[in-house]
Each structure stands twice: as structure tokens, then as C-alpha cells.
Amino acid sequence: MASLLKSLTLFKRTRDQPPLASGSGGAIRGIKHVIIVLIPGDSSIVTRSRLLDRLVRLVGDPKINGPKLTGILISILSLFVESPGQLIQRIIDDPDVSIKLVEVIPSINSACGLTFASRGASLDSEADEFFKIVDEGSKAQGQLGWLENKDIVDIEVDNAEQFNILLASILAQIWILLAKAVTAPDTAADSEMRRWIKYTQQRRVVGEFRMNKIWLDIVRNRIAEDLSLRRFMVALILDIKRSPGNKPRIAEMICDIDNYIVEAGLASFILTIKFGIETMYPALGLHEFSGELTTIESLMMLYQQMGETAPYMVILENSVQNKFSAGSYPLLWSYAMGVGVELENSMGGLNFGRSYFDPAYFRLGQEMVRRSAGKVSSALAAELGITKEEAQLVSEIASKTTEDRTIRATGPKQSQITFLHSERSEVANQQPPTINKRSENQGGDKYPIHFSDERLPGYTPDVNSSEWSESRYDTQIIQDDGNDDDRKSMEAIAKMRMLTKMLSQPGTSEDNSPVYSDKELLN
């Protein structure tokens, strides 16, 4: 039997691994299309600033074709380095495109103020043809046209510091678009604006250089359409991360934005590990999870084998991304989402409307968090050197804190858990709701929220862990023979809570405190 389990583990790991690169054949290359990328031909700030001005205008032209737009965006993205040409040649390895670098220098004879560098030949007319939209469009009207601030005529500067701030403002907006351009382009506007405000408050960008919605939509759509552009952006991020020593300020900003880009599209996998496995609740011992836990283990190993490109597999359209979807481990994912909803309010906005979502295991995760609140793991306590008395103190404090948090919580909470088994479901359907709320301004009794203290099948409490605090959970006494008995039980528990509060007030001596029993309160 041990050999069977070992073979099963090896089988699942082998099945989830991608094929190894081998064989006598070379790399498969597709039919390439040429992309023209403009780079400054000198180190002058005027040249870079003028080139940036012309490129920003070209991006907003709706008639521009896709490959030309991709080349323009690559030119803008590489303007912050000292040698853009060397950077592009070093990191570009795309089987779908062929990059053609063209140097640009100032010219007094061309209408656009720039020309293509050549050995003796004049290419002013070709440069004017390339930048013809500039002269026929917004430049003739005396405005840049693609900024929200319509008072800005152009973005040409002759100072290196001003150019860096201007370029950082434009690059930040492009990089922010990458975070959700592939996964959620239709709902990305709000998060993109929040991040822009963040960098504005940090003085990394200037708010006056905010591009308008039309310009941003064009860039976002191109990022979503063109895999070659995304490959370049990911390669640029990785190249910046690898570079030693202090990095330029724009490079540090790109790394900061990368925190929003990394692992885009892998939320199901990452959250399942975070809430389903790292929390280490006893529910992981269920037989239903054994197969999916092995799947998660093999996926984590595959993630590590993919190396530095693993967090960008969705952005790079890697075919292995489907293995990481929640459909490969639906029960464990549903359970993890239930845990996450209870632990973090931010999880309440997640969309769980998927065909493989299992409500029963979602409620299992919720119930595990509620029933485990205030407990201290014996294994972790032993590792940290926490004594039994300290664990008891932590349990009491955590129970009271969790109770206050539960009352103030605004996330999706279920008022009554009918859970996994039909016996409980039938009883719950026959009984009235056990949660009653009264306003303080209204007459009558106030009934608190009650939680049952039943244990799930297969759940073994940790005997070395601290027990729940009585101030958090009270034993709910429900009788099946009528509503009057239920009301009496709730009134008795409410009175018991009031007496407990009175006894815990300052100045009350423990020696003179009367002892009350549940039977006396129920009579």
C-alpha cells in the first residue's frame, strides 16, 4: 500500500510537469512582422524630450496600425535608460516579431523637428511621413490634445530633472495598465486611478500630466491585444530586478508597480494556499481534500520549476496556466474562500459565481474560522515557547477581540449555518431563525447572536489548545417542542450575559461574588 501511494504521488507530479526542452530540432519560429522602434541618436535631453512629445501624440491616433503602435510604446518604455538600443537588443527574444531600431536626431529642415540618422542621406521627408499625424492634428491646433489638462501645449523640456519627472508620469500610467489589461480590462479604471493617486501623493508623478481616457484606452487595448508588447514589458521588469546596486528612480517605480502586476490571474491559486493551507485548520484532514492537496503540492513544485516567469504566466499566455485554475481543486478552493471571507473583509467583494463552486465547503471554511476563534495551536505554541498560562491569556483576549470584530463586520456573513448534513438542515428548516435584533430605542428584550457548539464529523479538538471564551460563544439551548421554549432559552442566556457583565465590573470582589448556575436561570 505504501508503494501505491508513492507511485500515485509521482504520477501526479509527472502529469503536471511540462515537457522538457530536448530533441535535435531548433526553436519553432512563427511568421514574423517587422516593428520599427525609434531610439534617440544622441544623449541630448532635447532630442529625447522632442521624441517623447511626438510619440505621445502618435499613440492617440486611432488610425495608426498595430505594429507601429507597438513600436511606439516600446520606444516610450525604453526612454528612461541611458542606452535604449542596447537594452532592447539584450532583452528581446520574441519568435513573432523582428525589431528594427531607427536612431532619431534633431533636424531644422523637417517639419516635425526630427529626422532619421543616416550616413549622408537626408531622411527628413521620411521622418515627416512617419510623424505626419503631428503636423495635421493636435500640433496645428496648438495643444497636445491627449492630456486631461488642455492648457499644456507640448511636453518638450531641456532639463534632465524635468524630463525624468515628465517621463515618469507617462510611464507610470502605461505600467499601471498592465496589471489588469489582460485579466479584468473592463473593471480596471477604479484601481488604476487609486494607484495613480498614490504615486501623485508620493511625488513620484505630476498630476498635471494625467493622460485622458481615450489615450489610456488605446494603450490598454494594445497591451491586451499584443503578446509581443507584454513579453517586452515582462522582460524589462525582470531585467530591472536582476540589475545590482542602486537603480534609477523610474526603475524603482516600475518595480513598485510590479507588485500589482505580479501573479495577475493567479488569485485562485494564491488565495487557496494562503487561506486553505497556511491557516492549518483541522479541516485539511478530511478525506475529501486528500487528492486536491496532492494536486496543490504538485502545482507548487511546477510553479517553482518555471522560475522567474512563473508569476507572469497569465500575462505571457503560457498554456500551463490552466492547470492553476480553481477548477483543478474545486473543493479546497471553495473551503479556502469561506475561510478568507471570515478572516478578511476585502475578500467579501470576490466573485464566487463559478460552476465548480461548492457552497457546502464554503460554509465549512466559514464555520472552521468561527469555531476556532480564540484557540492557540499547540504545535505552534510549543515551537514559540508559549506556556499554557500565556496561551490561556491569549485565547481570552483573542476571543473578546474576535467577538467585537464579528459585530462590526460588514462582509458577507450568513445569519444561520445549515451546513453539510441533512439532519441539521432539516432541524434548521423547522425552527425559526435564532438571530433576533432589536434597536436600543425600541422596547422589549435584546437578543444577541448565538452560535451552536456542535462539532463537525471528523473534527478533533486540540486538547492542548485554549478553550473558547464564554464571553464569545454561549451554548445554545433549543427545544423542538415549541417557540415558547426557544424564547425562554434565549431570555435565560441574555440574563446570564447581563449577570456576567455585572460581575466583571470594577470593584467587584471575586470572593463575595454569588455563583449562578444555568439551571437556576432557566427555571
Curated annotation (Swiss-Prot):
Molecular functions (GO terms): RNA binding; structural molecule activity
Region (RNA packaging and organization of the helical nucleocapsid): 1-375
Location of the region described as Disordered in the Swiss-Prot/TrEMBL record: 422-470, 501-523
Keyword Ribonucleoprotein carried by entry: yes
Disulfide bonds: none
Region (Ncore): 1-403
Region (Ntail): 404-523
Biased composition (Basic and acidic residues): 447-456
Family statement drawn from the similarity comment of this UniProt entry: Belongs to the paramyxoviruses nucleocapsid family.
Name of this chain's protein: Nucleoprotein
Organism listed in the record: Canine distemper virus (strain Onderstepoort)
Originating gene: N
